[in-house]
């Protein structure tokens, strides 16, 4: 089973001036990324106020809209692969689902979330403009593509782009960072987050306070819990962990009986035996 040291290795906590005057204690993102904060996050390290220091700030340089600029000098090949992967484009999910609903011909890839226009690909139609299946895809199947924002509720916390995998979030959004600025923000939201595993918290996932990663540190030793922030439905991540989601019930049922029930990924679970590979301590990355 992964320990903190297995995931992150040695951790360096930074001190100094500029950004580190407020963010004292923040973890070095990687021993191979010994850059100034502003090299990736922009902003103004000499700013004397929050507004001045955070002017033009890029909160997630690894977002796919930013990655080619901030990560591409060293990781151009990886970015190109990720940008055309199914996790970014959703092409396979779109093709299979639209075919099953009778909205397109078999084997004809027409739509993508990141279309290659020169190859004749199109953006997936909006909910109002497309077929019924396109609305289903946008609100269900494609909720977890790399450009989408994650719901602010237990099990679903994550970043986007490269950080969706390489920046680890816990299921409850708890952070171990020693960044004093982030710790101050977390303390302010504690009252709101005290019921965070209850259904009444999960249903407000669009307005709940955001979570922060376990540490401000990249890793390639990605634990299964990170994969399961997206891969938790259709019997993949949840059953691997020994969780089974019962059939959905009408909202009126939950309003009367379930507001205080514990949920993960926005739903209740029954407990089953975990997958044998999980019991033996294996993680997704051991095979995938």
Where are these regions (language model features)?
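Short sequence/structural segments immediately N-terminal
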Residues: 1-288
């Amino acid at each position: 089973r992964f320990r903190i040291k297995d995931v992150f290795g040695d951790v360096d906590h930074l001190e100094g001036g500029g950004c580190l005057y407020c963010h004292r204690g923040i973890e070095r993102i990687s021993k191979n990324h010994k850059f100034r904060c502003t090299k990736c996050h922009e902003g103004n390290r000499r700013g004397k106020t929050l507004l001045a220091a955070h002017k033009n700030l890029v909160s997630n340089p690894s977002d796919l809209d930013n990655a080619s600029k901030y990560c591409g000098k060293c990781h151009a090949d990886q970015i190109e692969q990720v940008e055309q992967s199914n996790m970014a484009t959703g092409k396979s999910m779109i093709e299979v689902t639209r075919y099953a609903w009778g909205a397109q011909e078999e084997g004809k890839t027409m739509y993508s979330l990141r279309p290659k226009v020169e190859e004749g690909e199109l953006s997936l139609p909006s909910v109002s403009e497309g077929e019924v299946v396109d609305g289903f895809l946008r609100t269900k199947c494609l909720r977890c593509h790399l450009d989408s924002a994650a719901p602010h509720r237990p099990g679903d916390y994550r970043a986007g782009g490269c950080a969706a995998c390489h920046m680890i979030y816990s299921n409850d959004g708890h952070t171990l960072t020693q960044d004093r600025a982030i710790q101050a923000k977390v303390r302010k939201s504690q009252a709101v987050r005290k019921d965070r595993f209850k259904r009444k918290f999960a249903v407000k996932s669009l307005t709940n306070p955001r979570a922060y990663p376990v540490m401000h540190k990249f890793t390639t030793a990605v634990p299964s819990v990170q994969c399961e922030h997206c891969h938790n439905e259709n019997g993949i991540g949840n059953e691997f962990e020994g969780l089974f989601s019962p059939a959905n019930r009408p909202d009126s049922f939950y309003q009367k009986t379930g507001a205080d029930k514990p949920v993960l990924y926005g739903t209740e679970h029954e407990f089953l035996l975990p997958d044998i590979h999980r019991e033996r301590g294996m993680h997704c990355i051991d095979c995938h």
